[in-house]
Amino acid sequence: MSQQEFDVLVIGAGISGAALFYELARYTNIKNIALIEKYNTAATLNSKGTSNSQTIHCGDIETNYTLEKARKVKRTADMIVKYGLMQNAQNNFMFSHQKMALAVGDIECDYMKKRYEEFKELYPYIKFFDKAKIKQIEPKVVLGEDCNQDRPENICAMGVESGEVFTTVDFGKMSINLIEQAQKQNKNTFVAFNQEIIHIEKKDDIFILKTSNHQEYHAKSVVVNAGAHSLYLAHKMNLGMDKSCWPVAGSFYLTKQKLLNGKVYMVQNPKLPFAALHGDPDLLADMNTRFGPTALVIPKLERYHGLKSVPEFFEALKLDKTVLKVTFNMFKDATIRNYIFYNYLFELPFVDKSLFVKDAKKIVPSLKASDIYYAKGFGGVRPQVIDKTKGELMLGEASITETPGIIFNMTPSPGATSCLGNAERDAKLVCNYLGMEFNEDKFSSELL
């Protein structure tokens, strides 16, 4: 078999593509595996450390997760930690910090007490923090607006102190590590950068893939892990036409000094499909605090690569009556409508910081506009997929598998945390299609 012909070809070298590339190489008997990336290195978009909150979302402090969802997420999140320990990644790309879900006011505190009782069996390490304990581990959260006395509201939290569990990952570094480890598995593993796939077609049982610089690859099976571009490429093949996508960008603000010792999340508004504001020590900014994300719909699939992805956005959107109806129904809800408009204001010069600080003060009451600055170049784009058949937003990952042998994945947050679990699912699908084997025993002993 020549270098340009493969059993499996994975498109996209972010954390999802890298995880699948690794699992195919390590846990299957597939011999010829390719990873194709359009930029000059791995993880330049959503998996880059500046594009996400660097959090292992295991469900303990994510208040938008039900107990049932938390069980599923925990399984895949634990794989991240197991892999990191296999690679001795402690303090390299995997770190342990304090983290908590913060409740402010009597209503939220009552909710948090109930949530703690419900979740403590699944997360035995989790502890309930009263105001005094929070003051001990996160003093800025308790300090009042005047910096002289404690904030007046009733507050509590559920969380874990530093050193007990791993909480933080540089998913960009982890992507590179996964690719390096895949190339050590005695397989024909081929990695190509600066190769943008622009055309895919299936002839007989072979997929033919063409790039923008006139390269051609052939593969028996293809998995597209290209973020919002996965839907764009599917639509070009006339697949996934029952799905549309609004790209949602997230921005962050950085502090000029370290304000928080660990991750502080707020109670999620159940009406909103977006993450609640949180504060995190940033691995790439001297552990200064990063607040965010905001959420704004933008008319392009990539945020920081000019206007090239604007026409690609319209191809992925496929605007029609159903998309308009779903969007209109969202805007009919005052909570969602106000949230979306408010987040656009966070992007406007002169008013952005003062407005943002009002929200962030719920975490650090003494925070002032002069303490923060807009984190230019930070934040990624998450595809919020619309199911046209059901006429609603799809929360969580979406896959298109209608043509045998090719999978298109769109992974909004927490896609990085679920990368190894999603890779397990796709590796098994690929093996089943090709008549190959997935080594369950080896996988379970190493990652479960």
Curated annotation (Swiss-Prot):
One of its GO terms (biological process) is tricarboxylic acid cycle. GO terms for molecular function: 2-hydroxyglutarate dehydrogenase activity; L-malate dehydrogenase (quinone) activity. The FAD is tightly bound. Keywords: FAD, Flavoprotein, Oxidoreductase, Tricarboxylic acid cycle. It is an enzyme of class 1 (oxidoreductase). Its EC number is 1.1.5.4. The keyword Magnesium does not apply. One of its GO terms (cellular component) is cytoplasm. Disulfide bonds: none annotated. Gene3D superfamilies: D-Amino Acid Oxidase, subunit A, domain 2, FAD/NAD(P)-binding domain. Its cofactor is FAD. Catalyzes oxidation of malate to oxaloacetate in the citric acid cycle. Donates electrons to quinones of the electron transfer chain. Belongs to the MQO family. This is Probable malate:quinone oxidoreductase. It comes from Campylobacter jejuni subsp. jejuni serotype O:2 (strain ATCC 700819 / NCTC 11168). The lineage of its organism: Bacteria, Pseudomonadati, Campylobacterota, Epsilonproteobacteria, Campylobacterales.
